[in-house]
Amino acid sequence: ALVLLAFQVQADPIQNTDEETKTEEQPGEDDQAVSVSFGDPEGSSLQEESLRDLVCYCRTRGCKRRERMNGTCRKGHLMHTLCCR
């Protein structure tokens, strides 16, 4: 399912008020948070539960600690790494 995600990701800045992210390095010009969409408007409850707290970034230089690579994403016409935690 996450491989499918790589082709459907659209860049969309997201603000996170989580205390953990305040102490970590914030996304800069090279990193953008993205929203995740699977195309099925109804979705499945299992899918919704597992993705509820998923935060992904489209990164140009690879994933940071506590993130894992979940595919690729686009910024304009360039492909980058999709990193989620």
UniProtKB/Swiss-Prot annotation:
Paneth cells of the small bowel. PROSITE patterns: DEFENSIN. Pfam families: Defensin_1 (PF00323), Defensin_propep (PF00879). Keywords: Antibiotic, Antimicrobial, Defensin, Disulfide bond, Secreted, Signal. Residues 1-11 form the signal peptide. It is found in: Secreted. The keyword Chloroplast does not apply. InterPro entries: Alpha-defensin, Alpha-defensin_C, Alpha-defensin_N, Beta/alpha-defensin_C. Residues 13-48 are annotated as: Disordered. Residues 12-50 form a propeptide. One of its GO terms (biological process) is defense response to bacterium. Disulfide bonds join C56-C84, C58-C73, C63-C83. One of its GO terms (cellular component) is extracellular space. Probably contributes to the antimicrobial barrier function of the small bowel mucosa. Belongs to the alpha-defensin family. This is Alpha-defensin 14. It comes from Mus musculus (Mouse).
